[in-house]
Amino acid sequence: MKKLKIIFSFLIVVSCSETNLDKFTFSTWVGAGSKFDKNTWTKKINYYDSLGISEILVGGSPDILKKIIPLANKKNIKVHGWMWTLNRPGDTIANKNPDWYAVNRKGQNSLEFRAYVDYYQWLSPFHPDAREHIINNAKKLIEVEGLESVHLDYVRFPDVILGADLQPKYNIIQDRELPEYDYGYHPIARKEFKKIFDKDPIDFDYPELSTEWRQFRLNTISTLVNEIISIAHSNNKKVTAAVFPFPEMSRQMVRQAWNDWNLDKVYPMLYQNFYRENINWIGFATKQGVSDVDFPLISGLYSPALKNPKDLERAILISKENGAQGISIFTADGLNKEQQKVFIELSNKLNQ
């Protein structure tokens, strides 16, 4: 009889685990701002809960996150700490160290020459002090009790190629890798590369053809991420990341090889309109990402490009059909009434 009880208990645990694994997660990115207001966040949490959202990726200081977590816990909503990793606009510590910043092929520093937009102020993953600063930022989030994960964003180089729909907005035609947008040429990087290959990448006529030079830059991002993950895991904290659509695409566009990272979960941003693609592309990118990694994938969706509720519904369903374990919307705060209805209906339907 005792053995039967043990077996029965085991089956219950397994059944619960399988149910949890089968759950299709609805989540959202949200900025917390610089000040915490309990009433505002209570309303936000209730709103997210009404939509079936069970996880929120919050951009805010550790102190603010500590105040949001207890409110979210009341609704069984998990809170992730959304961290801008290498792009550090307004970072007062980094600003005092111009040599920490990424350098493009023209020799321009990212603090002084800000590609595309003013908030593009990128640190170089090759500079040891910049790396230490980034890791220290992650450690502050790792220490937050009850935080579901450290959620890394902007963990890459600046876009060497923008999405097709974004280029006209900046009056740019990027039919090749232009030197002012091609980053990774920090003096430390060039010196280390030359030690190995006896070549300075700044002298390459066609640097985009050097697989060694691309891989060299990919590796420095990957080692940074995996170091953060190692520290987090040793403190029983998960690490997730918002990334470009699928590994091959992200390698080319932003020097980001996220299939080489030891993540607990990944959130590729499948914003199809940026690339002038259709809803089917979301399914393609999801399937490609799922096939490239052995950790869970959550499809990131862009609400302004899915204002038609039928498009939003199709984007969610095609993500699930192609192996995603959930979706994350940018952002739930911007959903119209019809989009909200889709969330409510599908969050119930897909998790019955």
Predicted regions and their residues:
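Aromatic-lined carbohydrate-recognition surfaces of secreted/lumenal glycan-active proteins
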Residues: H151-P158, Y183-Q252, P296-L306
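The substrate-binding groove and active-site-proximal loops of carbohydrate-active enzymes
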Residues: V30-S34, I53-G59, Y116-E132, L209-T220, ...
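Catalytic domains of carbohydrate-active enzymes, especially glycoside hydrolases
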Residues: S34, K38-I64, V144-S149, D260-V266, ...
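Substrate-binding cleft of secreted/luminal carbohydrate-active enzymes
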Residues: L263, Y267-W281, A285, F295-Q352
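Aromatic- and acidic-residue-enriched segments that line the glycan-binding/catalytic groove
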Residues: N87-A115, V155-I202
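Short, acidic/polar
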Residues: G33-D49, A130-L141, P247-W261, W281-A285, ...
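Boundary/entry segment of secreted carbohydrate-active catalytic domains
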Residues: E18-K44, A241-P245, P304
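Active-site-adjacent "subsite" loops/lids of carbohydrate-active enzymes
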Residues: H80-V144
